[in-house]
Amino acid sequence: MDPKFLVVEIDSKERALQLVQVMLENGFARFMLLDDLSRHPTLDRIQREEPRISRDELRETASSPVTFETRHSPYPVHEQKVLFPSFSQVSNSMVTSTGIRQEASSVGVGPIEDDDIVEEEEEEDIRLTSKPCVKRRYDHHAEEQEYRDQLMSLLSGEPEIVPIGVNSNDEPSGSNSDSAAKKAKSVGDYHECQLCGVRVKTPRSGRWNLQMHVIALHCVGRQYKCKQCDYLDYRKSTMRKHTVSQHGSDIPPHNITDNIMKAEWHAAMIKCFPEFAHRTGFLN
């Protein structure tokens, strides 16, 4: 049988090693790695013995598909026939008289490319799976229930009474006290409660803060009562939160203010802020 040649362009040493490994594993033992096709001994001998064969005849001879049978290998390899495309399907510009051009081959080696793709995918999977990835699991139902419980506790509980003003014991001394007094006069007046010593700030045109201080800290009576239960408070805003959280709707509170409460508030105002006793507004 006349020798047949399969030309595969290799663009790197790594590709050449991969091709050699694949051929060895499949039982092929006769192959050469050449930089110049003219250096092949068989091709050189043919050119010397048959100089009259034209280039067209060689191309016609090589145009038919060829098959290679696997040789005996010590490894268990199934006998198979590999069909390669003919030279006529390859562009003539790929092979020159000086050797093989360093370009990407138009005749691809399928198994090598598939192996490279598989190896890249495996490396990518290993890289992704090797990263520490911690998933935090949230119990949305538990968080929602906890938030609802906190909100209900905040709305239904007794409001925390924070006096409006500052304690007289924290007054600055010296020049700082003078500057603080000037600043206080510019934004409003501070009045010290005679019962608890808390300084309450009130606007120049009103006394609402003083009244709230007296009712919240020094009186028992509360003017607002829930229409659905016995809850009492002195602020409408707190009553609204209570009705929404406990009864599911915004129910206007019932004003239970009577003369006894007004008298209590007036007496407390006289003790807390004597200068406002004549105009407390509770008995008007």
UniProtKB/Swiss-Prot annotation:
Coiled-coil stretches noted in the UniProt entry, renumbered to this chain: none
Stretches with biased composition (Basic and acidic residues): 50-60
Region Disordered: start-end pairs: 50-71
Gene3D superfamilies per record: Classic Zinc Finger
GO cellular component: nucleus
Primary location class: nucleus
GO molecular function: DNA binding; zinc ion binding
Tissue-specific expression: Expressed in FLP neurons.
Chain positions of all zinc fingers (C2H2-type): 224-247
Signal sequence, start to end: none
PROSITE patterns, A to Z: ZINC_FINGER_C2H2_2 (PS50157)
Alphabetical UniProt keywords: DNA-binding, Metal-binding, Nucleus, Transcription, Transcription regulation, Zinc, Zinc-finger
Subcellular location: Nucleus
The keyword Metal-binding is assigned to this record: yes
Protein purpose: Positively regulates the RNA polymerase III-associated transcription of small non-coding RNAs.
Miscellaneous section: In the presence of polyglutamine, mislocalizes to the cytosol and loses its transcriptional regulation activity, but is able to promote protein aggregation.
Name of the protein this chain belongs to: Transcription factor lir-3
Organism the protein comes from: Caenorhabditis elegans
